Amino acid sequence: MKRVFGVFGDPVGHSLSPAMHNSAFSALGMDCIYHAFRVRPENLRKAILGAEAMGFGGLNLTVPLKEEALKLDFIRPDPLAERIGAVNTVVFSETGEIRGYNTDGLGARQALLEAAVEIRGSKVVVAGAGGAARAVAFQLAADGAEITVVNRTEERAVELAKDVAAASLPGKINGTGLSGLKELLRDADILINTTTLGMHPNTDTTIATAEELHSGLTVFDIVYNPLETRLLKEAKVAGAKTVSGVLMLVYQGAEAFKLWTGVEAPAELMKKTVLEALQA
């Protein structure tokens, strides 16, 4: 019988994780299948315990479940996930433990490195203060970036900045409201959108327009559906370098794949699969 893996979230119909992971399982000759499951926050406890009872191999968690997972007393988060305050990967261990990890930050870091973007010393604006933003902020602070988190609710941005600062990482960080975004972008080296603005089906929304961007900027949108979000289109008009959310999706997925199986994931194949699905 095939071993089942999956992604829990709401909404989750847009997810390309099933195509990506199923291509990897197939290429490696593994008798496994990966599905997307719509799960609301109030049902997360039952859903994860149900998956364990049915012998699932592992799970990914996406919006809005990453932070909710840490509230569950049966999940054993690793130190990084606990520090970030969000779990995106669940492993059902042979000892019976349900372990929580966060691979989002590593995925974002690898995406920037593949695009030949210098992180250390760069001035980075992170838009959003949710689970993905926390992962990105902790990772880039560890890599020595100077980060400003901007969020519609300023208190959440400030709280995130305080959490990262308390970890005594090499980078610097502060938080502010969205009203300061335009001014911050003038001096920024990297803009990372971790909000859902621009995600299908609301593809005409964006955190910033071409007039607010500049050619010395790298614009990284973690939204990957559509492949070219409105933010990335605006960035191209401004002459900025762009980094697709596909890369973060692939590299966080590759990290999760290895945690579940102990096997190196075929990342290039996974990227090819995602790009083909988005361009279909």
From Swiss-Prot:
Pathway: Metabolic intermediate biosynthesis; chorismate biosynthesis; chorismate from D-erythrose 4-phosphate and phosphoenolpyruvate: step 4/7. Transmembrane segments: none annotated. The keyword Oxidoreductase applies. Keywords: Amino-acid biosynthesis, Aromatic amino acid biosynthesis, NADP, Oxidoreductase. GO terms for molecular function: NADP binding; shikimate 3-dehydrogenase (NADP+) activity. It holds the Pfam family SDH_C. PANTHER family: BIFUNCTIONAL 3-DEHYDROQUINATE DEHYDRATASE_SHIKIMATE DEHYDROGENASE, CHLOROPLASTIC (PTHR21089:SF1), SHIKIMATE DEHYDROGENASE (PTHR21089). Belongs to the shikimate dehydrogenase family. Homodimer. Involved in the biosynthesis of the chorismate, which leads to the biosynthesis of aromatic amino acids. Catalyzes the reversible NADPH linked reduction of 3-dehydroshikimate (DHSA) to yield shikimate (SA). This is Shikimate dehydrogenase (NADP(+)). It comes from Methanosarcina acetivorans (strain ATCC 35395 / DSM 2834 / JCM 12185 / C2A).
